[in-house]
């Protein structure tokens, strides 16, 4: 199946749906995950485009805990927190954004470590 039919390019905007959107004819991603795992996000797409759908799917599944943690609070709070945890210097929050709940921050830190980016 193909979405867009060559008239419009479709990009996945949900990190938990990269492979399904590509399978429907999507051409790429607009991704929160790519801020903390750019190489891995690129590889998910590249494997798919190279015909390694199973490998792409497995990488997508491997990223699911991190994807879920990156959206456990209002965006962009988790991704900014993740970047700060990674030493990327994303800075302090400005109103109306605030720090993550402690339990969610611990969940995010664990997901980053488990995924190998922290």
Where on the chain are the PLM-derived regions?
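Distinct, well-ordered alpha-helical segments
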Residues: 1-3
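Intrinsically disordered, low-complexity regions
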Residues: 5-7, 117
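Structural preference for beta-strand elements that scaffold enzyme active sites
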Residues: 7-11, 27-28
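Structured C-terminal cap/extension of enzyme domains
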Residues: 16-118
């Amino acid at each position: 199946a193909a979405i867009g039919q060559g008239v419009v390019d479709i990009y996945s905007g949900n990190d938990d749906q990269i492979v399904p959107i590509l399978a429907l004819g999507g051409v790429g991603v607009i991704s929160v995950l790519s801020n903390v795992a750019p190489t891995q996000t690129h590889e998910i797409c590249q494997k798919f485009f190279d015909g390694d759908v199973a490998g792409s799917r497995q990488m997508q599944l491997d990223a699911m805990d991190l994807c879920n943690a990156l959206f456990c609070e209002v965006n962009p709070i988790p991704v900014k927190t993740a970047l700060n945890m990674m030493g990327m210097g994303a800075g302090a929050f400005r109103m109306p954004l605030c720090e993550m709940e402690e339990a969610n921050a611990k969940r995010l830190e664990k997901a980053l470590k488990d995924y190998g980016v922290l």
